[in-house]
Amino acid sequence: MLQGRCLPLAGGVFALVLSLDSSGRRFWVACSCAPYQHKRRVHTVGGLLSDPHNFARACALFREFSAREERSGVVRAELKCPVDVRDSFLRASREIDPRAAHSLQQEEVLGDGRAALCSADCLLLQAFTHFHNTELARYRARLADIDARIVYERFLRDWECAVACAHFGIHRRSTVFTRVHSDAIRDLEEQRAALALETPESFFVLHAAQWLGEVERVSSGVFAQTPSVSAALERIATSLARGDAVLLRGHLGTGKTELAVLAAERFALHKLITEDVRCALNEWCTAATGGSCAEIRGSERGVSDALQNSQEARTQFQRLFSQRAAYYEQALRLGDERLLQRIKPLFISGSKHIDTEDLFLEKTLVLKNSLEGKTPEHCYQDVHAFTERGYAFDPMLDIYLAKYGNFGTEVQKIEREVLRAVKEGRPLVIDEINAIPMQHLIALNDILQKRVGDFAYIPGVGPVKIAAGFGVIATGNISSGLVHYEGTGALNPAFASRFNTFEYDYPPQSTEGLYTNQAHPEKNELFRIILARLASSGGSLCLPDIDGSLDKLFKLAQLAKVTQQVFSGKWKDSTGGSETHDGLGDVEPELREAVLSIRNVIRVLDEWNRGEEKDVDQALWDGFIGGVLNADDQNYILSQAVRFGFFQEKDGWSVRPKGIGAGFTSYEEIRTRPYEYTRLPDGVKTLAEVVVLLFGHGPTYAMHTQNTVPDVVDAGAMLVLHDRIHELVRVCAAFRLLQEKSYARECADRIAHLQCSCDQLVSEHARLRSEGGTPRALWDDLARAEQTSDALIQELLPEFRHCFPDICGDECTYSDVFFEFGKSITAAIPLAEDSVLIAGGTDDIRLLYRVHDQWLVAESTHKSVKTDWRICALISMGDGEVVVVTEGGETIVLSIQERSKKAERRRVSFEVVARVEGVYERVLCVEKVNAHRVVVGDETGALFILEKSAHGYEYRGPILGLGGGIRVVRALNTAQLVVFSGFSGTRLLHNEEYSDAIYGFENPYTEAVVLSEDRVVVFGDDGESRVLRHEHGMAAGDYAYGEWITGFKSVVLCALALSSRMVLVFGRGGEARLLSFDATGTAQYSRSFGNTTGAVVSAFLLQSEHPSVFNVFIAAENGTCRLLTVHEFCEPSMFKERLSKIVAPPLHDNE
């Protein structure tokens, strides 16, 4: 029997000791994390379970030694990127036919003797999953801590610079205190860079965070922030903070304008956040030390002396910074006009028609009546003044009319962008500055060389004080001997010297190699920008013919880089000479008008990614090459495209080289047959695979024999692996089978056989039931099906229904729409067994009641609750009281009394009992805890508690500590809540104190459903979900996320727990599915129930006459209400369980 145990060794190395009982021979296989095993403590379990192939390789070494009867030797095997190995298993387990996967889990030994998973293996798989999630969570926490400390140190450094400027003069910015913070920032950045080299998990966490950030920015309309973009933004921010103007020079399509606008917005937003946090920290410092930060600063102490080494101060800063950042982010997302005016830069688009007045102050003539602006009171005062001077009435009236009754013109001054930016303290972006005539730009000289707080001379106005927040960013194209931009000119050297000028080039990209063997993948930023536009919010890629598409996209990036280098005059071929124009000899390549810039690359992607009804070659022609306006440029780019593998003859293209001056190339000229395109099946690259593709392989694990292992030290806490090594061999075999998808054909044969059996049994069913016999054949097939998969039962469910119509009704049925609100429904709750309360808009609340199968609207004496905000939640508190919560935080308590309870005609009255104040920010979620308590979460991350007492209702709180807005809050019990925040992740709230963050859910939260105190299903904005659970053996109050649950493609807006094993899920478009859990906790989605014709706002259970039938009331956003009837038999495991009790009675002896 193969046995093993794990011993910790010196230097962070652990050894796996393998032995064979029959011979007693032992071999050492040591695993270490290179190259930093001397710097980190390797967890014993983690080192072994981080890669299942470590076990297989260890056992392979053992068998090799046994076969050769070697008692010693040196064998070293390097393992290639455990991240790939783990992720290949995860991807295969998701993509493989679910019937095959279930076969692996259920069958002990297959026909050909291949090993499969067993219950013991599942324990090891759970251990591996636990280790993997723990390591990821640990490194995410370390990364978040380092990033938070960098932000904190930069904040203190900038504060010290501001203090130095105020006390020692505007040019004195560097002090001993600023240098301390600069050194701390450098050390933290070195720690961050070294973090990626520790383990494969740390490498993945660091680069996955970077990649997901780029994808998120692209999805929000901002271009990907690659390292070159980040460096440019940092340089611009540093210059603006010093008060220097910035000039970005570059060729067309580099993204200069977008970069300038983004940098200006970040500069303004950072200023607002910093000012708010400084004020708040000053207040906190005053309360903590008895004096403000400025007051405690002595001649030898920095302004941050009281804050730098205080953990409490850093925690306070992180809380304040996250809250303010989340507040401004939410306000910008909602389109707050006042905030947009403060953050959005003033913009000037360069033109030769712009003069000095267009920059500073525009003067215009306005026709104005002399009486304009006069009120009747003013006119009466004028008349009275004339009367007092002794004028007679008639002469006085003539004089008055002559003075004020005529018309005239006056000069009106309109402040333009430069003057407004100086006075209001806003960033100014001047696009294409070299298109503005130089004689007008010189008027900016005084402004460009002054700093904040100085008085700058404005032509036509005079001296104006420069307000804080002002900054200038200008962009301009680079003209060269090959390329000249019409309408632009050279800047005066004296004028240009007032700018901090640097060139912003096209993003880096290698023009050699393939995407599968990139020498430095992290430097191929153009390829990364392309993939960021195609990736999902979770960072994965789903493309037709995934490998072929990635190859084409990589070559598209290479082609774009070649055109960019040729256009900018920087292209040299691999031999160091000039590139030859195809067929023309040694001719220097040049492009005069066309270049495959980022803008054009995005146009090609949009042309291709619109359903992928064409391949990349056709999209390249339609989106760019076919529209090039210079014939020589078109022919050269076309020849280079052929060089990189586009427009090949096997695909129906025929591109022949053309010389200079040969004319344009038409589409019909290069097509040899009508264009047809058949899209290949989709493929998936998971997040881990994309990280390897874009950033390369991280640190790897290595295995060594005993001769290369350091001396064994004290064993300490040993991990005994007796009786498990042989199981791990079978686990690895199962992994390989999953990757190879070797069971697809066998499962297809099994399904065909079972379906044929069912078809035969359908025809025999009536006879069997009439004779009172048991359908034994069906039961035999059912038994075999139980050994196969729930997915198979799901597929055969319609046939089973024909056999047993008495226990299997329809899966689910929608009723017709029985009520139309006339406006958007925002909230709905059940009041009694036969009545429902619905709210819409800002003031409309109605009561629906059911008479038999008909729903009617009750007459109400008061329909309006008189609110200024949209109603977002209704909470029934019992005794006819309902709490109404609006988005603006306004809370109203209503008393609902029925005046008449006639069956056909009910009358109710709504009376406002109280209006409760306490929430002043936008409300994002509301949850009822018990009959006396409701919790409300707002967009700033604050949580308020609304309590009902004998004296009425009142708010208590807020409970702070989270940022990014509280998206969802759910009550586990009356004393414990689980809170899902947009910035601080998942946390438990007990006795008004938050637990540590629970990591494992990176997507934005949209909904959560409590199945029990130990299980909560959490949904993200991409439709995927995970179960937050408390497992047996965990400490009290500890929760962890389980595996991802896939199968729902839409954003989940509403979900309802039908039982502890069934959840009804509604998507944004109204799609409905059942999410069911079997006895082992494995989750599976049913097929779609159809569409509710609108996004579901609220869904809840009504009373049902049958315990296995659920009646669900659905209120949709479009104002419609209907019922959904769900039978629990549509859940496969429940169906099999019920069917086994009904169809398989005890057999008689004669059977």
Curated annotation (Swiss-Prot):
Listed InterPro entries: P-loop_NTPase (IPR027417)
Identification of the protein by name: Uncharacterized protein TP_0245
